[in-house]
Amino acid sequence: MTHFDKPTYTVRKTRKKEIPQGVYTKDPVSGEAVFTKDIADNQMVVPASGHHFPIGARERLGYLLDPGSFVESNIEVRSADPLQFVDSAPYPARIKKYEKESGLPEAVVTGAGKIHGVPVSLAVMDFRFCGGTLGSAAGEKITRAIETAIAQKIPCIIFSTSGGARMQEGILSLMQMAKTSAALGRLAAARLPYISVLTHPTTGGVSASYATLGDVILAEPGALIGFAGPRVIKDTTKQTLPPGFQTSEFLLKHGLIDQIVPRTEMRERLHQILLALYVKQTPASASVAKS
């Protein structure tokens, strides 16, 4: 071969190893790829950074309650369309879309169950259904969960995640703030404990009513909690907001919540609180807790 000869190359084709979709999930805190299975096995919390991914209402109930103890109630309560509201789509069409996306008939799941044998009435919100907004059906279900606690003389626990009142129902949605708060007043008069757990995000009319009326208020780490969002406040006040404004850590520092509890510790922490506020204070409940 001379200096002017064109060299020949052999191209060897190799098959690129493809990683199946869904094996890894990016951690928003560290930016690293984490095995999805490791996150799922840790209640959708990244083991290293502690980042809490959103979960559905039924998943949360599965993490919290004794196996087989949950009995769902108020399944028949559904959203109506009293205002015949239409924006880019009719309200009933939106409801059907939310039902399909979330697998739920409404933004909250209610029922009764047990935590280490202690009976409780629960309402657990799900952000996937219309952003967890509070409408007349959701408000009715939450009120009934509180009334169940009163009737059965058991504690009430509400997990909140919401964008606020549901605009498609107008004043009927706003009325649920007063309705649920009044029911909690009756629960307090019956001297029964109410534990409120705030998860990301809890805003608007929900944060301004039952979410912040608990005898004990817990929150998951890093949750956004407030009435108006930080962008709206910044645009309105024309001021720079402090770091971490409206996070659960900020609220704990300023005395607006009682504890921050990681999801993986929530079941045990709730049990401790129930023992202090209910079992030890109510002699008749001790035998129920052991059953």
From Swiss-Prot:
Name the Pfam families on file.
Carboxyl_trans
Which part of the chain is the CoA carboxyltransferase N-terminal domain?
Answer: 23-291
The alphabetical list of record keywords is: ATP-binding, Cytoplasm, Fatty acid biosynthesis, Fatty acid metabolism, Lipid biosynthesis, Lipid metabolism, Nucleotide-binding, Transferase
Select a single GO molecular function from the record's annotations and give it. Answer: acetyl-CoA carboxylase activity
Cellular component per GO? acetyl-CoA carboxylase complex
Q: Which PROSITE patterns match?
A: COA_CT_NTER (PS50980)
InterPro entries for the chain: AcCoA_carboxyl_beta (IPR034733), Acetyl_CoA_COase_Trfase_b_su (IPR000438), ClpP/crotonase-like_dom_sf (IPR029045), COA_CT_N (IPR011762)
Q: In which pathway does it act?
A: Lipid metabolism; malonyl-CoA biosynthesis; malonyl-CoA from acetyl-CoA: step 1/1
EC annotation? 2.1.3.15
Family from the record: Belongs to the AccD/PCCB family.
Question: PANTHER family per the record?
Answer: ACETYL-COENZYME A CARBOXYLASE CARBOXYL TRANSFERASE SUBUNIT BETA, CHLOROPLASTIC
Annotated protein name in UniProt:
Acetyl-coenzyme A carboxylase carboxyl transferase subunit beta
The gene for this chain is: accD
